[in-house]
């Protein structure tokens, strides 16, 4: 590996004006051997007028997503198809990265021969860390990431060679964890830098997390596919995580009208962790018996607290 490898920076966009600020934060990187791929998920090329004046920079490539299903996963796939760098990263079009972000991540990747290096982020409202952290730089093992030891929003780079032909599932809405965990499993070990290298926007109503009700069928599919692919790993390394994910999956299954799938998740959770049989059973009954509007209102009001309690109760500490 050469000492100045090219890093491909994918900026998926729907043509929001915040794209300009995001792009400038990438252009202002101390590390300059970059390939910047702006992938536009609008049919009319809404982003192009915003970035027209930047296209004279030979490092910038503007591409419209016509190959994949429209949505965050498909648009990122369009970016992945166009990368030529030895490493790649993804920056959403409403976030900004620190001037030293890519340089610091890349230095650690090269020095330690890591395929994945990540750092924390801070939110744009209170400036708080968005990713779970332990107050220090450290090696990260894939099982700890998989079992929730590193949970939240991070910013990192990944060696392109471990990606191969893997892509996000564009039938899903969000659900990017399937690919990332697949890559972590392949890498086995990475490294965490304990500092914020990205400002993560949490107040944007266009974010994927704010649109799950509109895309409930595609959101439900995330959990079905994730539990199917990683069921054995969950059983072996963190069976309580299976329950946590199933509870959320049950909710989306009911909203999508996939009641058989909700029962399947409930039964699987009971079999995998019978000591906590009451949790999936009660939650399934709650979601199915009560009016859907009430269930949605309850989940939206308490989902953050609900997920936090689940993580604390079911996950506990990390594995190492």
Q: Language-model segments: which ranges?
A:
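A conserved acidic beta->alpha catalytic loop
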Residues: 25, 39-50, 69, 92
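Catalytic core of nucleotide-sugar-dependent glycosyltransferases
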Residues: 180, 195-203, 209-236, 261-269
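Short, well-formed alpha-helical segments that are part of the catalytic scaffolds
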Residues: 15-28
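Glycine-rich, basic loop-to-helix element that forms the pyrophosphate-binding segment
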Residues: 66-83
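Conserved donor NDP-sugar-binding/catalytic core segment of glycosyltransferases
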Residues: 100-131
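Short aromatic/hydrophobic "clamp" motif used to bind/position activated sugar donors
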Residues: 88
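Short beta-strand/loop segment that forms part of the nucleotide-sugar
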Residues: 33-43, 63-65
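Conserved nucleotide-sugar donor-binding catalytic segment
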Residues: 9, 130-211
């Amino acid at each position: 590996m050469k000492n100045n490898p090219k890093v491909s920076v994918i900026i998926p966009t729907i043509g929001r004006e915040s794209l300009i600020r995001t792009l400038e934060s990438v252009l202002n990187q101390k590390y300059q051997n970059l390939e910047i791929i702006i992938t536009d998920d609008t049919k009319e090329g809404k982003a192009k007028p915003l970035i027209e004046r930047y296209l004279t920079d030979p490092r910038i490539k503007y591409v419209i997503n016509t190959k994949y299903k429209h949505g965050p996963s498909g648009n990122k796939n369009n970016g992945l198809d166009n990368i030529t760098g030895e490493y790649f990263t993804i920056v959403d079009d409403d976030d900004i990265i620190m001037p030293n972000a890519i340089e610091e991540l890349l230095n650690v990747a090269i020095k330690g021969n890591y395929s994945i290096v990540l750092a924390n982020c801070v939110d744009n409202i209170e400036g708080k860390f968005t990713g779970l952290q332990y107050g220090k730089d450290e090696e990260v093992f894939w099982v700890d990431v998989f079992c929730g030891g590193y949970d939240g929003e991070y910013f990192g780079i990944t060696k392109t060679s471990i990606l191969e032909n893997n892509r996000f599932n564009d039938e899903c809405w969000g659900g990017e964890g399937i690919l990332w965990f697949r890559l972590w499993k392949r890498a086995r070990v990475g490294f965490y830098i304990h500092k914020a290298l990205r400002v993560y926007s949490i107040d944007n109503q266009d974010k994927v997390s704010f649109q799950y009700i509109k895309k409930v069928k595609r959101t439900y599919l995330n959990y079905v596919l994730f539990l199917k692919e990683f069921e054995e790993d969950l059983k072996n390394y963190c069976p309580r995580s299976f329950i946590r994910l199933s509870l959320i999956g049950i909710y989306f299954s009911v909203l999508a009208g996939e009641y058989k799938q909700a029962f399947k998740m409930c039964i699987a959770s009971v079999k995998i962790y019978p000591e906590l049989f009451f949790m999936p059973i009660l939650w399934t009954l709650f979601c199915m018996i009560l009016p859907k509007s009430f269930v949605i209102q309850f989940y939206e009001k308490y989902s953050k607290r609900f997920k936090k309690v689940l993580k604390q109760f079911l996950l506990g500490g990390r594995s190492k």
